[in-house]
Every structure is written in C-alpha cells, then in structure tokens.
Amino acid sequence: KFHAYFPTANSYPAIVADMLSGAIACIGFTWIASPACTELEVAMLDWLGKMLELPAEFLACSGGKGGGVIQGTASEATLVALLGAKAKKMKEVRETHPDWDDHTIISKLVGYSSAQAHSSVERAGLLGGVKLRSVPADEQNRLRGEALEKAIEQDLADGLIPFYAVVTLGTTNSCAFDRLDECGPVANKHNVWVHVDAAYAGSAFICPEYRHLMKGIETADSFNFNPHKWMLVNFDCSAMWLKDPSWVVNAFNVDPLYLKHDMQGSAPDYRHWQIPIGRRFRALKLWFVLRLYGVENLQAHIRRHCTYAQQFAELCVQDSRFELAAEVNMGLVCFRLKGSNERNEALLKRINGRGKIHLVPAKIRDVYFLRMAVCSRFTRPEDMEYSWQEVSAAADEEEQQQK
C-alpha cells in the first residue's frame, strides 16, 4: 500500500546474497583483490544484457570493446557517462583546436535532456562543470528528434560544442518514453554521446512486448537501468553498459603503485569504471536472483505490476470526479481530481494524512496530479481496490468539507 516514488525491490534470494557479500567482505576495486567479484560481475552483466536483447556491442562476451558494470545508482551512471563523454569530446576538440586550453573548451560544452528528465541529470551537469540544456517535450511528455536537432543547431550557431544527450525511457513524473529512435540518429549525426536512462522501466525490457519502447538502442553509447527498482534485487544495483568503456576508464584512471598488479589489461579493474575506488560484491545478489527466479518468473512479476496499474486506472476513470493526467505506462498511474491544482493538493494531503496508503505528486506544464506506483512484490488485486477506496473516501471527505 506504499505507492510513492518508484519501487525499491527486494526478495529473499537478494537478501541472503547481500548477507553473504557482507560475510565475504571483499573490496573489489581490482581483479587481483577478488577475482570472483570481478568475473561474476562481467558474466552477470552479459546475462542481463542478453535478457534485454541489448546489441552485442554492449556485451563483454561479444569480443569487442563493450562491457557492463554495476553502479550504485542511476545518478552515478548518468555522471559517469557524462564524464566519459566530456573526456571524449575534449580530446576531439584539442586535435582540431590545439591552441584552445581546457577552460576554453569546457566553457563551450553543452549537453541535452528532456525537460522531463530526472533531477540527477541536472546534478550531473553541476558536478561535471558543464552546461546542460533542457529541451521541451512534446504533448505526450517525450523528447523528440526534431526538438533535439533544433537545440543542437542553435547551440552550434552560437559557437557552443554539443557533446552529450540523455534519452529517458520511463520518466519519473509520468513514465513517458523519449523517442530514442529519433533522438539517437540526430545525436550520432552531430557526434554527441547518447546516454539512455531507463532506471525504472528498463526492467520491463526483459518482456518482449515492451522492447519496442527501446527501439533505436543501437544508436546509444551507454545504457543504464536499476534492477534494484523492479527486478527483485535489493538496493544498490544499477546496471550500466558502455559500447567503448575506454573513454570512462581513461577519464578516471589514477594508478598508484599499491593498486597495480600483473593481470592489468587482461580483466577489467572496475575502480576505473566508477566514481568510488572501493566497491561491494553486488553481482552476487544479481546471480542469486537470476538463478533462483529465472527469466519467466521475473517477467511474470513485471507483468503483474503492469496489470495492477491498469486495474487502478480503470477504477479511476469509472469515477466521474477523476481523470487520468497521462497515459498509463508500466506500473504507474497518474491521476487527478477534475478541477484546480489546489483541490488536488488538498486531496493528497488528506490521503496521506489518513495513514492507510502513501502517494506523492508531480506537476507537468503547471498541472498538479497524483502518482500511484505499484511498488511491492506482495501487491495483489485486492490491494488496488483497497487503495482506490482510500482515494475515493478521501475525495468524499474533501467534498464534504468544501460544502
């Protein structure tokens, strides 16, 4: 009955694996520090990538440059991708403008994201010391290729250097899907790094019926989603794939004598793929969950949540006082009382004040609405009915008070 934010997953296999990881107590910053920690992570990211049907260029088993890494959060992945893109673009600009210093180049760099992108994208820009431009979304809250092209062309005309674009698949406000199939080719044409943020919705791509939403993934340079949101792996476990990790590795490469070893170059040292140096044995819980649940059970879990969201949406539209504020995607329903924002603010305060269910709001184009996310693996159809009854009862109380 906790329906705020997006899910934070857990399961008994993941909990046991986390306990075992704590007992093993390895700090897997290099291969030599814990070969199993590194090797299992390489294997698990390949397993997971195959479940999503990611292009082979992202997978270590392809024999190419690509590979995956487990970050702590999608916020970290967004920043890591930005810093890799920044390093790549600065190298390119130095070759064409050898007289420009780093400060001059950095001052001209500009990145892009939808106005509906997560706040962590803006934060990555602040931490990376670069400008990020918010591009208006369309009426369905999606970033479109035409809008991105227009923004890039304008910045090029102003003497700026486009270097990075974040395409969101499953926005936080309304679970909208940017048009990767349009934005990717535009970014590729201008040699702009494409990072795909699918933090919540990415788990659904293990189901074939949802993979059309990631059409154009072959145009991306990096892709990220959080198994710890919707795939029964407890926090923290954020999967990230890179087509060419060398840009990130070279950007982060600090190699003191005490971390050197004879196997460098033959296996990844994941300390070069992330912001921290030390890292937990996070691949263990991913392995436990994949082995004990299997793909079909994980798919069934995703599909149940999507069905429950549709059930709640149907209950909502059957009440003439309410309306849907956005298309129902995945396990999220955006709804509101017809009328003013103030009415909906009062309704949310009353719902949460009753203490039976918990929701959070969002606002798009100055329209305030409530978000109902299916969060628990224990949720059943009767819970959706109960939650709707709570919403309806709170609306009744609010109407009585207004009389």
Curated annotation (Swiss-Prot):
Q: Show the segment(s) annotated as Disordered.
A: 250-276
Q: Does the keyword Lyase apply?
A: yes
Where along this sequence does the record place binding of substrate?
T8, H118
Query: What are the N6-(pyridoxal phosphate)lysine sites (modified residues) in this protein?
Result: K229
Q: Give the E.C. number(s).
A: 4.1.1.28
Q: What class of enzyme is it?
A: lyase
Alphabetical list of InterPro entries matching this protein: Aromatic_deC, PyrdxlP-dep_de-COase, PyrdxlP-dep_Trfase, PyrdxlP-dep_Trfase_major, PyrdxlP-dep_Trfase_small, Pyridoxal-P_BS
Signal sequence range: none
Q: Which domain of life is it from?
A: Eukaryota
Entry annotation: catalytic residues: H118
Q: Which UniProt keywords apply?
A: Catecholamine biosynthesis, Decarboxylase, Lyase, Pyridoxal phosphate
Which positions in this protein are listed as binding pyridoxal 5'-phosphate?
A: A74, S75, D197, N226
What GO annotations for molecular function exist for this entry?
A: 5-hydroxy-L-tryptophan decarboxylase activity; L-dopa decarboxylase activity; pyridoxal phosphate binding
Q: Which cofactor does it need?
A: pyridoxal 5'-phosphate
Q: Which GO terms describe its biological process?
A: amino acid metabolic process; carboxylic acid metabolic process; catecholamine biosynthetic process; serotonin biosynthetic process
Q: What does this protein do?
A: Catalyzes the formation of serotonin more efficiently than dopamine. Displays no activity to tyrosine. Variation in the synthesis of bioamines may be a factor contributing to natural variation in life span.
Q: Which family does it belong to?
A: Belongs to the group II decarboxylase family.
Q: How does it assemble?
A: Homodimer.
Q: What is this protein called?
A: Aromatic-L-amino-acid decarboxylase
Q: Which organism is it from?
A: Drosophila lebanonensis (Fruit fly)
